Amino acid sequence: MAYTQTATTSALLDTVRGNNSLVNDLAKRRLYDTAVEEFNARDRRPKVNFSKVISEEQTLIATRAYPEFQITFYNTQNAVHSLAGGLRSLELEYLMMQIPYGSLTYDIGGNFASHLFKGRAYVHCCMPNLDVRDIMRHEGQKDSIELYLSRLERGGKTVPNFQKEAFDRYAELPEDAVCHNTFQTMRHQPMQQSGRVYAIALHSIYDIPADEFGAALLRKNVHTCYAAFHFSENLLLEDSYVNLDEINACFSRDGDKLTFSFASESTLNYCHSYSNILKYVCKTYFPASNREVYMKEFLVTRVNTWFCKFSRIDTFLLYKGVAHKSVDSEQFYTAMEDAWHYKKTLAMCNSERILLEDSSSVNYWFPKMRDMVIVPLFDISLETSKRTRKEVLVSKDFVFTVLNHIRTYQAKALTYANVLSFVESIRSRVIINGVTARSEWDVDKSLLQSLSMTFYLHTKLAVLKDDLLISKFSLGSKTVCQHVWDEISLAFGNAFPSVKERLLNRKLIRVAGDALEIRVPDLYVTFHDRLVTEYKASVDMPALDIRKKMEETEVMYNALSELSVLRESDKFDVDVFSQMCQSLEVDPMTAAKVIVAVMSNESGLTLTFERPTEANVALALQDQEKASEGALVVTSREVEEPSMKGSMARGELQLAGLAGDHPESSYSRNEEIESLEQFHMATADSLIRKQMSSIVYTGPIKVQQMKNFIDSLVASLSAAVSNLVKILKDTAAIDLETRQKFGVLDVASRKWLIKPTAKSHAWGVVETHARKYHVALLEYDEQGVVTCDNWRRVAVSSESVVYSDMAKLRTLRRLLRNGEPHVSSAKVVLVDGVPGCGKTKEILSRVNFDEDLILVPGKQAAEMIRRRANSSGIIVATKDNVKTVDSFMMNFGKSTRCQFKRLFIDEGLMLHTGCVNFLVTMSLCEIAYVYGDTQQIPYINRVSGFPYPAHFAKLEVDEVETRRTTLRCPADVTHYLNRRYEGFVMSTSSVKKSVSQEMVGGAAVINPISKPLHGKILTFTQSDKEALLSRGYSDVHTVHEVQGETYSDVSLVRLTPTPVSIIAGDSPHVLVALSRHTCSLKYYTVVMDPLVSIIRDLEKLSSYLLDMYKVDAGTQXQLQIDSVFKGSNLFVATPKTGDISDMQFYYDKCLPGNSTMMNNFDAVTMRLTDISLNVKDCILDMSKSVAAPKDQIKPLIPMVRTAAEMPRQTGLLENLVAMIKRNFNAPELSGIIDIENTASLVVDKFFDSYLLKEKRKPNKNVSLFSRESLNRWLEKQEQVTIGQLADFDFVDLPAVDQYRHMIKAQPKQKLDTSIQTEYPALQTIVYHSKKINAIFGPLFSELTRQLLDSVDSSRFLFFTRKTPAQIEDFFGDLDSHVPMDVLELDISKYDKSQNEFHCAVEYEIWRRLGFEDFLGEVWKQGHRKTTLKDYTAGIKTCIWYQRKSGDVTTFIGNTVIIAACLASMLPMEKIIKGAFCGDDSLLYFPKGCEFPDVQHSANLMWNFEAKLFKKQYGYFCGRYVIHHDRGCIVYYDPLKLISKLGAKHIKDWEHLEEFRRSLCDVAVSLNNCAYYTQLDDAVWEVHKTAPPGSFVYKSLVKYLSDKVLFRSLFIDGSSC
């Protein structure tokens, strides 16, 4: 046995040393296979031969610019501008790669010989001879073809097969291959062509006028054009000469003449129009007709060449919806027509529309211009004294760095020489991380003198302006204005400053002042400003009488007080509301009371917008007498209704539901409408020129919902008719090949100008020869639509709802009583069921078909219910008792049965709530069961802009029943359902894991041949559905269409790369998509989205957790778990399994590459190699540069490989590097701060936020410095410390500004991969002598005790000497069902960033707690300018402020500073829980709280490099805080635990045992595995590569709990 163990160990060591030949051979084989795979992948790329002779640098440029190709460089042909010429072939191939192979392509100005050699018979080259060079170039191409053919003939070869078709075409029909007309006049007509047409323009777009380009493309029916051209951003400056260095070319500009040439070559120049090229660069839209435009989009920039594409856009696809309420209906519809035409004009015909109006777009497409500004340079002639000016591009950061610094110069120091000296120094100085560096600004040194003069002139003018501004303010006796402010101050008391500031900000008052005469010129112009030429003008500040505004403000203040009870009152725009109340003469107080009543739904009326905006509330409350003619009336009044038959006789049918110019009470049941045929030939204006909804709905909520439903039908009908009229008006410019949702029939020719996708439309819109438009009932014969003589055209729509909307409106108007809907008294029960709970099955089991009625939204669902009900062979379900909702409403009253006992509505929540109320009323039932799912897709308002308020969407019911057991969904989907539903969702399915996802390379990958999809195919959008159907997939539906359906297997596909709003974590569409299958679902997507994250989370679930959701006969047994474990953590003992390899695997997955770093000799390498250090002022004792040799005991060697470093040896170099990276590398970010006043305000906020109200004032009767406090401090000290105080007489203090410096021997491990690229500096310790600590230690211990006793411990935790159990108790009352934002503030260089302001804040906190003034001043001076001495390393230096890491206040001081920092930036009054420890913080806020720009505030006020993170789980002091529905559990970071197992400082076995015990103490919570799944989520949130880690957590528990087993993690270093 011993021999076997010895042999195993020896083999293992041989493998580690690389002596195992088998392992070495396997590694070589793996390396060889990888290399072969990589070369094979490269061989599959398109091959391009580069024959021109170019340099190695140019070879690298070409290779990097075009990674899509495998380029072979032959270097066999010398030529002029060889790189540019060779790149031209690459550019051509790149453009052709964008085009589908075989599609007809026009090459504008192209090389037809290149296409012949590639065998592209589908390309037509347009090669006009604009000058003699073009003729010469074309002849050269013909010569290359003849040379190629003669070479084949001489060798007895024939043209290869792939070229044969192209050469035959060129030989037989040369005009099909190439023509010599311009692209605008080209008349090439393809013989037979199907599919889309494309075009490319390689360096030829310059010669086509931009205004003619769109029309030329449309004449050739081009779908997309790809173009490439040379350009430089510098052409947009005032430069007349611009170099293109990479291709050795240049642009020269003279007015509008732009010349392109190659440097140092005698080739001819190319001349173009600068303004024409600028249009191609800056414009977005290129009009082609009054309907279509070509929209430009930049693709990429490669080697001074810009690539872009022009896409054909049909502006008729812009949707025109009708859902607005106007005072004058005729004016509204006229204005709507004008607005739509104006919108179309903007999209097509505005030739000055500029793409780069957005600065973010400028930065993206002009990357060299990002953060660059254009600065003027000035010069003067000595002979003529004439001043000259030019412009250069300079980094904006560089400009403000210089200006901010030289602005601090005193008047005498502000000289040109000093400015130039500073500019030259920051351009040349080298600093990186305090050690080595180079300048971050690459400014041309030849420009430094001119730039310095510009900076100097600007600063001198700015200083003069400031002096004049200050002189304008009176500093003597009080002015009249000041006396007014004093009187206001007396009235408001202490609140005056904030009131004054509020009034100034609101512009209700203004401060008078004289106009200033000095204007400092703009220092720079941004690149974006130069493009769009935007300028702003200054406005003087006039005087203003504030008395009237103060009275108005008082009125608005009272109104604001009334509005303060609203949830979002802070978002109400008071200025807009005030203006509207004033113009309409509405009392603001009355308006405020109405707003509160409407928002709380207690008023009995509803405004038809989503929330009452300021203007609409004032308009709704306008006095009736002041209203204009035709304005809506809130109160009901009797109005005589016009005759319906008379309206139809005139062709003007009134069909405005409950809307229009009449109140709802004026409508009554009208027996005149007997048939829908009476609507035939009603004018379209009568349908689309009526108001679509009332401003105010009155009555109970059900009545309001029913009124809104009628108005929604009117709006839908109006929108459909309006769109058909628009199609008839714009038919002339419609492209016949474009797929449309409409159809237009030309009556004279009996042909469809636009062929509809469907047939036999019942209704349409007719255009007569008199250009009048009517709604018509269509009839058909054997020739098609039956038409009349005066008809010109007929428009139909595949999505038209004219017939159904008219029929439903006819039915609902009959049901109105005196203009009001009748509400049934039947009991309404909502059955809320999870997906797959068997809602349809339950309906069939409960229904009595002889007396009950079933209604469903869709025809397929109705047929499915009839089929299932009649499956036994007995026909019980017929079209009389199982109907669709539309059929029931349209045919109401025609059936033999008109009354039912019970009504069952399946998927009722997909209907408008008013529709449901009407169905209950129309069925005359006693009880109605509405089956639905509150979390799935609700009713969607399809009419754009139609108001459907949020409280209308909630169905009013008498009782709610829940169904929480799914018969369909597998266990993993059931786990997801538990997040979305209240209560416990269980499943009867035996399938545990069913979901998966696959990221595809692009939409083109999805096709039936290479990617057959299994099961039912679903998409989220109609566009994706149409794309899949067009590619050959069958039976494809959207998620919305299959709600309520069940399938065994589902393939869910997303082809749209742009963001889709319905794909979100809480989207009902995602819920429906995940719950349609019983066995499997696979999600194919082209982008990462929230659904991918959800599926990945479900894939990581462990099987034992999924077993908890399985139930056989109900949910009662599962529901008992909550009452048993409420208020305490569920405990499940962790199994002790796993091996060392599990820990190593987990560490390598989380931190890849760290374990491979051989860092044992990093410290030796640093001491033996040359090093350059940038050191601040300090004194070095070079005699300490060589450390004395010490006998080192070899530590134990860990078996787990981590990034842990070997212990470092103290020495001059090591300590100096640590001091440079720590103490000398403090950031300087803060702005100008009034330290004392700001510190006082911050401390006020600190006390108000964290301390109990009754303990905010210190107890002055308690002495801080007493014998008891000294004894408490001594009890915590070691005997060695007490011995150092034996000779201290406590009469006088040692120097409090003298500190000692040392380093920790063991570097701190970082849980990232930075160890692979940098040498980690040691942590420094700066500390006082024990004599000083003996004075201040007891004091601050007592102050700390008082502070912690005063903190509101129910909401805040100051983590000092707390156990993990206490942390769990503190966070244990968090309600996991309440949405929360978990915030963490991450601050880098926390200790070293603290400056005078931090010292003032901390001192003010201790002072208010009772710190004695004299000792407080001593303590403050001891932390101001301090001297550091490192006797071991021989270093002495001076630093200002900074947190001393070995000070008595290090920990508590850091804690109160982080708490004060957060209190000054975040709304602590809203916080749920907060914890602070040193520089760590963890905050829980209610979901949706608005937070300021924390990074900005932390930089300017606190000098912190801070980032605020929102998390799902908290991370605090190396522990994950997992809150759940029963409390909270705190897990020690498992990755940090594994990192410690790789420690290389363990001396011996006794030390190892102490190490194990300490790890056991901190990791005790890992013994509970009940919440390992949540721990996985928390770890993955920090480390995105972390796999599910339950296996490694169990392994850690196994080794930590066994003393003997733990020793196997290390081997004795002395035996190696």
UniProtKB/Swiss-Prot annotation:
Q: Which reaction does it catalyse?
A: RNA(n) + a ribonucleoside 5'-triphosphate = RNA(n+1) + diphosphate; ATP + H2O = ADP + phosphate + H(+)
A Gene Ontology annotation in the biological process aspect, one of them, is: mRNA modification
Ranges for the region named Methyltransferase are 50-458
Q: Which InterPro entries match?
A: (+)RNA_virus_helicase_core_dom (IPR027351), Alphavirus-like_MT_dom (IPR002588), DNA/RNA_pol_sf (IPR043502), P-loop_NTPase (IPR027417), RNA-dep_RNA_pol_alsuvir (IPR001788), RNA-dir_pol_PSvirus (IPR007094), ToMV_Hel_N (IPR049329), Virgaviridae_RdRp (IPR047310)
Instruction: Check the record and name the PROSITE patterns matching this protein.
Output: ALPHAVIRUS_MT, PSRV_HELICASE, RDRP_SSRNA_POS
Q: Which residues form the Alphavirus-like MT domain?
A: 72-281
Q: Any idea where the (+)RNA virus helicase C-terminal domain is?
A: 964-1116
List ligand-binding residues for ATP. Answer: G833, V834, P835, G836, C837, G838, K839, T840
Q: What is its EC number?
A: 2.1.1.-, 2.7.7.-, 2.7.7.48, 3.6.4.13
Query: Which molecular-function annotation in GO is an example for this chain?
Result: RNA-directed RNA polymerase activity
Q: Where is this region: Helicase?
A: 830-1085
For this chain, the family text in UniProt reads: Belongs to the ssRNA positive-strand viruses RNA-directed RNA polymerase family.
Assembly and interaction partners = Heterodimer of a large and a small subunit.
The UniProt record's further free-text remark is: This protein is translated as a fusion protein by episodic readthrough of a termination codon. When readthrough of the amber terminator codon TAG occurs between the codons for Gln-1116 and Gln-1118, this results in the addition of the RdRp region to the replicase.
Protein name, please? Answer: Replicase large subunit
